Amino acid sequence: MRTSLVVCLFWLLFQLHTTHGYNTLVNLAGNWEFSSSNKTVNGTGTVPGDIYSDLYASGIIDNPLFGENHLNLKWIAEDDWTYSRKFRLIDLDDTVGAFLEIESVDTIATVYVNGQKVLHSRNQFLPYHVNVTDIIALGENDITIKFKSSVKYAEKRADEYKKIFGHSLPPDCNPDIYHGECHQNFIRKAQYSFAWDWGPSFPTVGIPSTITINIYRGQYFHDFNWKTRFAHGKWKVAFEFDTFHYGARTIEYSVQIPELGIKESDYYRLSATKSLQTRSKNIMSLSIPMEHEPERWWPNGMGEQKLYDVVVSMGGQVKEKKIGFKTVELVQDLIDPKKPEKGRNFYFKINDEPVFLKGTNWIPVSMFRSDRENIAKTEFLLDSVAEVGMNAIRVWGGGFYESNHFYYYASKKGILVWQDLMFACALYPTTEEFIQNAEEEVSYNVDRISQHTSVIVFSGNNENEAAIRGHWWKASNYTESQQVKDYVLLYQRLAKIAKKVAPTIPFIMSSPSNGVETEEEGGVSKNPYDVRYGDIHYYNEFVNLWRDDTYLTPRCASEYGVQSYPMKETMLNWINESDWEYTSKAMFHRQHHPGGIATNLLMIFQHLPIPAECGSKSVSDVPSCKYISSASYMSRLAYFSQVHQSIALKTQTLHYRRFRNTTTNEGLGNTMCAMYWQLNDVWAAPTWSTIDFEQNWKMAHYEARRFFSNVAVYSFADETDFNLKVFLLNDNPYLLHNITVNVQMLSWGNGLDPILTNEFHIDSVPAGSSEVLKTGITFSKITELSEYLYVSTLYDSSGVKIHEDVLVPDFLFEVDFNTFGDVQISDVQRIDEKTYDLTITTDRVSPFTWITCKKPFTGWFSDNGFHMIQRLRKIRLIAKFEVDLEKSDFTVCNLKNCYV
C-alpha cells in the first residue's frame, strides 16, 4: 500500500510519539535443576528438553529406547516434576514491558517467577506470552515450573467426565499390546506419547522449546504472517504484524520483496492498552502489479520451487522469511452429473493444474520433541521423500503440528503438505472449556502453518468419523447418535475457525471421509469409506497384497501399508543380541500391532518359501514352527519382510496410479492420490515405515523411487483373461512423444537371455494419463507365472531408458532359488568424501539384490533391492556427511543367499 506524503504528515501530526527503542532478550535455555515430587530423584537438566532425556543424561536411567525400558520406566510418567533455575538481569533502565515467552509447555504446568504464579498451561500445542513487567527485578531472579503427571491428569479428567455425563469417552485405554496409557483424549498433548501401534509410551513433561524473557522499550515486533490470494489476474498479499506495546504510539512498518522490486511502507496507530498481554494485530494488504508477476511455486516433479525473500522491519527491528506463490483448489464435482450416484471427484489443482498426490504419511521424528538431532532427521527424511519422486506428505493427526522449519523445508523440496488437526482415533470432550482450548489451538496453528507454500489442505482429525460408524469401541450409555452429535459439535466449530483463519486452504472434516458429501450428510457420513467420495484408508492382512485385483479403486488413498522388520544392523543398536529372535520377550513387546506376530508370517510365506527346518507345515501352521522364531532365522525373516512390503506397496500404489483419468462403468476410479503409511519411525521395531529408526532406507523406499516415477510402466498378470497387461503412466504436465516399450520374458533356468521379446512403439502418451498396452503375451494357467520373469522397459525417442518394471512371480516359493545368480561387488571407486561408485556383477537373474555397508552412514544408494537382469550395474552411494569406505565394507546378496 503506497502512502501519500499528505497521509504521512497527518499521522505524524497526531502521533503521541514514535519509538524505535531497543529490546533485550534473556535466553532461559540451558541448565535447570529438576526434582521428583518427593525430592528423592533430582539432577541438572537441559532446556529445551524433557524429563526422560534429563534423567538419562544424568545417569539416573538407561536409554529409554533400549530393550524393554519403555516398560521399566513407567514410574517417570506417574510422578510430578519440578524444574527451576535462576537468571540475572543487569539492565532494566527505560523498560516499559517484559514478557515471559514460551514456545511450548509440555503440558499441565504452573509457572512461577520470583515466587509469583504467572501461568497455568494446559495445551502443548500453544505458545504462551506472559506479562512479568512488575515481577522481575534487577539482579537475581528465579523461575520455577511445576509439572503435573500427564497420565494422572488425563485419568482424573476422564473420571470427572464420567461422573458428570454418565458415560466414558472412548477409547478408555489403548489396546493392551501397546503397553501404553489411558485417556489421552482428555489432554491436549501429542496423542502418540501415550503409545501407538508403531511406538512406545513416553508421556513426557518439560520445556521442549525456546523460553525467553523479552524486555522492551517502546514496542516489541514479535512476528509477521501473510496470506496470498490470486484474483482477477493479480496477486494480493495480506501481511499481519504481531506487535506488543504499551501506551498509544504510531509505528512505521516496511515490507520488501527485493527480487520483485517491491518496497511498501505504512504508519499504524497503536492504541493505548493497559495490559501488555494484549497484542496489536495490524494488517497491510499489497497488490503486486502485473509488471512484477511472481514465478509460481510448483510441486516436486512439476516445476521449480520458487521462494522469494520477504523482509519486514518495524522500528529498527527486522525479520525475514520466504514466500511462495501458488493457488490450490480441491475439486469435488460430480463424476457424471446425469448419474450423481456415481459419486464425486476428489483431487487437487495446483496453479490450475491437476496433481496426483504421490507420497506418504509423517509421524513425529522422535518420542522426545527436543531431541537435538530432530532438525537434521527432519531434513534427511524430507530429502528422502523428494529424492524418490514423491510430491506430498500427510502430517498425521496424533503427533504434532510441525515446526515452521518443517513446512519451510517441505516448501523448499516441493512437498505438498496435507495437515491433520491433532485429534486421532478417539472421541473428545465437548465441554465448553475443552472446545475453547481446542479453538485457540487450531486458530494459532492454522494461522501459523497456512503461510507456508507447501500446505494444501487441513483435515479435522484422523479416523474419528470412521471409528464412530465402524463401531470401534464399546461405549455404555453413549449411543451412536450421541457420538455423532458430539463429534459434529466439536469439528464444526473447529472447521469454522480453520476456514476463517485460512480461507484459501481447503478444509475437510476427517480422514478418511467423503469430502463434501460428508458435509451434505450433516458432518458424519453413513459410510466414511465409500470409494466414490473423498479419501480412504485401506488395510487388509488377510488377502494377497501382491495382486492388483486385491485393491479397491477409490478417488484418493491417503493411508495404506503393511509392516516390515528393520534389519539386524539397526535392531542390535536397541536390543541385546540375545533378543534378536522373532518372539523373544523384547521383540514381542516391540510388536504393538494386534495380531501382527501371526499375520506378518502368514503374509510373507504366502509368497516366499517356508524354511525346510519347519518340515511340511502349511502357511497357516507357520507360526507354530520353532525355527521361524529362532535367532538363526531372524535376519532372513527381516529381509523377507522387507521383500514382502516392497512388492505390496508397489502393487497397491501402481494400482491406484493406473486409474488416473480412468473410470469403470460404475464410476469407480479417477484416482488422484496414493499416500502410503508410513515414512519414518520413532524407535527400532516392526512397523509400517519405509525408513527405519537409524535412517536406513528399507527395500520399500528404494522401490518407491520406481513406483512413484513421474513416467512409469506397470505390468501385472490379468487372470480374468490370462493376459499380461502393461500400463503407461505419465504424471508430467506435457505429452510424451515417440515412446518405445520393450517387454521381455525370461526363464529362471535360461540365464540372462530372454526367451521372448516384444516391442511396441507409441506415438504419444498424453499428460497426466494412464494408458493400457495389450502385449499379446498370454499364459494358460496361473502356475505358469512362477516359471518366468516379465520385464517391461520404457524408452524415449532417443533410446534412453526412462523406466523399468519387473513382474516377479506371486508364488516365489515355487521357484528353485538355486537358479538365481551369484551376485558380487567387483569394484568400488571413491568419487569424493561423500560419494562411492560400486560395480555389481551377476551371471544369472538376481532378484531383490541387496547391498549393505558395514559402516553406518547417513544417505542412500542410487538403487537397492533391485532385480538384476544384466551382467553389470553401476550403483552409487550418496552420503550426507564424509565417510571413509573401501571395498571390504560392502556386501551384496539376493533372494538366494541374503542372511542365510
Curated annotation (Swiss-Prot):
InterPro entries in UniProt: Beta-gal/glucu_dom_sf (IPR036156), Beta-mannosidase-like_N2 (IPR054593), Beta-mannosidase_GH2 (IPR050887), Beta-mannosidase_Ig (IPR041625), Galactose-bd-like_sf (IPR008979), Glyco_hydro_2_Ig-like (IPR006102), Glycoside_hydrolase_SF (IPR017853), Ig-like_fold (IPR013783)
EC number of the protein: 3.2.1.25
Keywords noted in UniProt: Glycoprotein, Glycosidase, Hydrolase, Lysosome, Signal
Signal peptide: 1-21
GO biological process: carbohydrate metabolic process; glycoprotein catabolic process
Glycosylation positions in this chain: 38, 42, 131, 477, 576, 661, 738
Active site: 463 (proton donor)
Keyword Nucleus: no
Gene3D superfamilies listed in its UniProt record: Galactose-binding domain-like, Glycosidases, Immunoglobulins
GO cellular component, as recorded: lysosome
Similarity comment: Belongs to the glycosyl hydrolase 2 family.
Listed name of the protein: Probable beta-mannosidase
Organism this protein belongs to: Caenorhabditis elegans
